[in-house]
C-alpha cells in the first residue's frame, strides 16, 4: 500500500487496485500474463508499480511487469529463463530496489533495480555463506526479504536449519541465526520489522497450516539473538506485520494480534489471509479465491479491551 493506494497481485495475471483506501477495488488482467502468479509487488509512487511473478524461470514464470500510469497499461521490463531462478520477494527503497530469487548457483539470486524500475542487473555477491541442501526462500507473502537502515535480511527454509541471512549491503552476506530445524516446505516464511533493532519472524510448514513446528521469534538487537515470543499461537504464519501499536500475524488458518505493552494475544478470526497490509487505521487481508477483508486498529483495540 502507498497512501490511499492498495495493490494486490493474484494468479492468472490478475491485479487488483484501489485508489481510495479500499472503498472500491478494480480488477484487471495484465496482457500476456495469463499463466503467471503475481506473488509480490513494489509500489514506487502513486502511478508506478512493479509486479513480480513467482514460478520456475525455465517455464517462463520469472518476470517483472511495470506500470507508470496506475495500471492502465503494463510493460514487461525484466525476465530470466535461467534454470533454478524462482522469484520470492521484491522491495523498493527510495531510489533503488532488490529482487530475491531462490538459488540458481552458489547463493540466492539477487537482482538490483534502478532508474525508477526500468533497469535490472544481476548481482554477484562478494561474500556469502554456503547454502544448505534444499535451502530456499519462500514466496508466500513477499516478506522473506526485508531492509532496515542497518542492511538486508533474508529468512530461509527448506534446508536442515531455518536461517537468517544478513547483508550490510546486498553484496556481502553472513548467516546470523541457524537454531531452528527446517526441512522440506518448513522454515521461516516472514520477517516483520518494527524498527532497525526490533524484528519478528515466523513460519511453519505450508502443508500443515494448523500446526506450529516453527516458533514465532523476536529479536531486540537487529537479528543477532532471537527468543520465542511468549504464548504465540501455533499455526502456519505467512505474514508478520508491525501495525503500531500491535504485531499482526496471518496465515491460511487464522490471524492474531499481539499487544507488546500488555504482553497479550487475541485471535482475529479464522479467515484465511496470505498477506496483510496497513492503510491508515485499517488492515487489509488478502486470501485465496479473491477474498479481501479488513479490520480497523480501533476494532482490535476494542477486542483487547473486551478480553480484560
Predicted regions and their residues:
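Residue-level hotspots at or immediately adjacent to binding/recognition sites across diverse folds
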Residues: 1-308
Amino acid at each position: 500500500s502507498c497512501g490511499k493506494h492498495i495493490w494486490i497481485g493474484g494468479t492468472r495475471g490478475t491485479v487488483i487496485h484501489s485508489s481510495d483506501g479500499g472503498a472500491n477495488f478494480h480488477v484487471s488482467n495484465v496482457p500476456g500474463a495469463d499463466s503467471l502468479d503475481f506473488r509480490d509487488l513494489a509500489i514506487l509512487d502513486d502511478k508506478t508499480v512493479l509486479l513480480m511473478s513467482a514460478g520456475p524461470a525455465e517455464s517462463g514464470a520469472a518476470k517483472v511487469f511495470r506500470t507508470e500510469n496506475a495500471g492502465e497499461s503494463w510493460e514487461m521490463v525484466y525476465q530470466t529463463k535461467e534454470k533454478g531462478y524462482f522469484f520470492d520477494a521484491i522491495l523498493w527503497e527510495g531510489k533503488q530496489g532488490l529482487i530475491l530469487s531462490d538459488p540458481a548457483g552458489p547463493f540466492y539470486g539477487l537482482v538490483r533495480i534502478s532508474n525508477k524500475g526500468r533497469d535490472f542487473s544481476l548481482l554477484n555477491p562478494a561474500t556469502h555463506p554456503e547454502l544448505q541442501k534444499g535451502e530456499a526462500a519462500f514466496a508466500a507473502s513477499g516478506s522473506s526479504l526485508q531492509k532496515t537502515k542497518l542492511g538486508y535480511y533474508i529468512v530461509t527454509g527448506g534446508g536442515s536449519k531455518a536461517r537468517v541471512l544478513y547483508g550490510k549491503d546486498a553484496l556481502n552476506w553472513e548467516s546470523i541465526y541457524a537454531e531452528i530445524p527446517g526441512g522440506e516446505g518448513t522454515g521461516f516464511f516472514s520477517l516483520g520489522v518494527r524498527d532497525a533493532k526490533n524484528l519478528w519472524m515466523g513460519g511453519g510448514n505450508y502443508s500443515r497450516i494448523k500446526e506450529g513446528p516453527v516458533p514465532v521469534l523476536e529479536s531486540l538487537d537487529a537479528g543477532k539473538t532471537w527468543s520465542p515470543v511468549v504464548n504465540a499461537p501455533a499455526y502456519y504464519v505467512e505474514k508478520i506485520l508491525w501495525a503500531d501499536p500491535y504485531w499482526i500475524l496471518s496465515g491460511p488458518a487464522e490471524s492474531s494480534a499481539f499487544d507488546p505493552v500488555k504482553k497479550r494475544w487475541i485471535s482475529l478470526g479464522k479467515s484465511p489471509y496470505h498477506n496483510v497490509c496497513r492503510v491508515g487505521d485499517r488492515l487489509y487481508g488478502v486470501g485465496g479465491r479473491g477474498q479481501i477483508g479488513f479490520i480497523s486498529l480501533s476494532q482490535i483495540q476494542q477486542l483487547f479491551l473486551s478480553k480484560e
